[in-house]
Amino acid sequence: MTAFVTKPVRERLRSTIVAALFCVPVGGLVSAVWAQDASEWDAQNHTAARLIAGSQVAGSDTKIVRAGVEIKLDPGWKTYWRDPGDSGVPPKPDFAGSDNVKSVTVLWPAPERFPDGAGGNSIGYLDHVILPLRITPQDAKEQSSLKLKLGYDICGNMCVPVESDLKLAINGDGAEEMAIEKAEIRVPRRVALGEGSDTKGVKGSGGKGLAILSVHREPGDGHDRVIVEVSAPASAPVDLFAEGPTPDWSLPLPELKGGGNGPSRQFTFDLDGLPPDAQAKGAMLILTAVSDDDAIEVPARLD
C-alpha cells in the first residue's frame, strides 16, 4: 500500500488536499459481514477513537461512501492537524488490509493554533474532532470493510503517542451522516488567489467570506519574508497557516502584523526551514485561512 500525503510533516518536531487529504489505495474484496454505523470505541488514557459510517456521496459518477475517524480527548487535551506546527506529530492513518476498498481520502477540518508549552505554537484540535473519509470501493455492488491502524499524538500536561486498531463494515447507509457532514463543513474549501469564499452565514460579511488577496516575497534579515494579505469580515478573528510544496519544507507559523480586526489583515513569515537546495522563487505554497465560521485553502506561487 502507498500513501500520498499532501501536507508537510516537520522533521525537527515542526511539521498542512487539496482540501487537505491523504489518498490511500488499498485492496481486497470484503467477506460477508454486516454493515455497521460505528466501530467500538478504542479507549486509551485521555483519548478514544472510533470509525463512523455515513451515506453514499450523491452526484458522483462512481460510488463514493462517506465515513469518518472520530477522536475524543479529555478536556484540555489536543491532537494535531496534518501540519502540527512548531511541535507535535500529525495523525498517520494506515488502511492496509481493508477489504473492497480502492482508495481512501482523508479530509482535514480547519484547525486552530495553541501554545505548545515550549515557547512555540502547535496546530490542531482541542477536545474532539472528526476527520471525514471518502471511500471508493473496488466493487461498487459490494459493501466494504475498513481496517485502520491509526497513530496519533495527544498532549495535555504531557504528550502521549497513541495507536488504535479499528474496523468497520460500510455500505453507504450509515447513521452517522449528520456528524460527518458537520465535520465536512469545516474542511477548508479550495479557492484561487484573490477569490473569496461564498459564506452567506458569516455575520457582517454581506455574503462575502474570507479571501487571500495577494502573496509576495521581500528581502529580510537572514531569510526572505513572505507577506500575505487576507480579506475577512470586519471584527472576525482570522488565522493563517502556510505549507510548502513537499513534506520536507518546514515553514514557520505566519504572524499577524499590527493586530487588526478590519477587513484587511496582513500576515508575515520568514522563508525558513526549506530543504537544502530548495528554490523559493516559483515554489507553490498552500495557504489556509481560518475564521470562526469559514475556512479556505489557496495555492499560491511565490514570486
Predicted regions and their residues:
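Extracellular/lumen-exposed scaffold segments
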Residues: 34-303
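Bacterial N-terminal signal peptides
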Residues: 16-29
